[in-house]
UniProtKB/Swiss-Prot annotation:
Name of this chain's protein: N-acetylmuramic acid 6-phosphate etherase
Annotated organism of origin: Picosynechococcus sp. (strain ATCC 27264 / PCC 7002 / PR-6) (Agmenellum quadruplicatum)
PANTHER family with a match to the protein in the record: GLUCOKINASE REGULATORY PROTEIN (PTHR10088:SF4)
Catalyzed reactions per annotation: N-acetyl-D-muramate 6-phosphate + H2O = N-acetyl-D-glucosamine 6-phosphate + (R)-lactate
Membrane spanning residue stretches: none
Oligomeric and partner information: Homodimer.
Keyword match Lyase: yes
InterPro entries: Etherase_MurQ (IPR005488), Glucokinase_regulatory_CS (IPR005486), MURQ/GCKR (IPR040190), SIS_dom (IPR001347), SIS_dom_sf (IPR046348)
EC number(s) given by UniProt: 4.2.1.126
Length: 301
């Protein structure tokens, strides 16, 4: 799509008939309208469930074999990718290089609008080259309207390097086709404020990324039951959470849980294995290494 071609046919650019009198609504009417329209994000996720599941399987398999996960986007889409990537280390104790967000314009674009930079496909290609992406990696391109040159350039470059690619967009495939290993279409319809894809499109994208990254970490053994057993204990809140996880799963007192946590060097997964298998920290580490970090599998050994 060139710079002179109309984008009015795109679902994300169309006018929402429910908000034609937006500027005349009361505050309560505005809240009700947003609430009504946001219900469509749930339906969009439900309709994309099979594609999301496929993305989870492909990504978890890649990361199990030494790959990395990259999100690529511009504007709101880029910021959402960076946000999701940034949450992985504290939540799952992953190294920062395992899940990375790439945004057109770099770090500065996180706080200052840099929309013009999204038109440079060559910059997207350079971003892929700079990170030395290989066939082991997974690259997720996020573009609400589907046409962002920066994102498409990055995905094409990633494909040329053999990486698995996932395309996330909020327009139908017939409007903007793109050949990727997984094609996720999150169709929430026209925005309340016409063309403002930071609204429903942004919300549904955040939902999809939450599902993708969390589910991948579940597959990687970062979770036991529904507890974040690989949480990075880096502040008072997370220290408290770690203690409560140990208490809940072991029936230890808070004081006993605190002693166990310190013996494990503040690693909840290690602490649990030490307690349940009656081993020291080094033996617990060895067991987890043998069983690819899976606490449940290590417990069965």
């Amino acid at each position: 799509m060139n710079s002179y071609e109309s984008r009015g046919h795109l679902l994300t650019e169309q006018v929402n008939p429910q908000s034609q009198n937006l500027d005349q609504m009361s505050a309560l009417e505005l809240v009700d309208l947003f609430n009504q329209e946001d219900q469509k994000t749930l339906e969009a996720i439900a309709n994309a469930r099979e594609a999301l599941a496929q993305a989870i399987e492909i990504t978890s398999e890649a990361l199990m074999h030494g790959g990395r996960l990259f999100y690529v986007g511009a504007g709101t889409s880029g910021r959402l990718g960076v946000l999701d990537a940034a949450e992985c280390p504290p939540t799952f104790c992953t190294p920062p290089e395992l899940v990375q967000g790439i945004i057109a314009g770099g770090a500065g674009a996180l706080v200052r609008s840099s929309e013009d930079l999204e038109d440079r496909a060559e910059d997207g290609k350079k971003a892929i080259a700079q990170r030395q992406i290989t066939e082991l990696d997974v690259v997720v391109g996020i573009t609400a309207g589907g046409t962002t040159p920066y994102v498409q350039g990055a995905l094409i470059a990633a494909q040329q390097r053999g990486a698995k690619t996932i395309f996330i967009s909020c327009v139908p495939a017939e409007q903007v086709p793109f050949a990727a290993a997984v094609d996720i279409r999150l169709l929430t319809g026209p925005e309340i404020l016409a063309g403002s894809t930071r609204l429903k499109a942004g919300t549904v994208t955040k939902m999809a990324l939450n599902i993708l990254s969390t589910s991948v970490m579940v597959k990687l053994g970062k979770v036991y039951g529904n507890r974040m057993i690989d949480v990075a204990v880096t502040n008072h809140k997370l220290h408290d959470r770690a203690l409560r996880i140990l208490q809940d799963l072991t029936d230890l007192s808070r004081e006993e849980a605190a002693i166990l946590l310190e013996k494990s060097q503040r690693r909840v997964k290690i602490a649990l294995l030490m307690h349940w298998k009656n081993v020291d920290a080094s033996e617990a580490e060895h067991l987890l290494k043998v069983h690819q970090g899976s606490l449940r599998t290590a417990l069965k050994s």
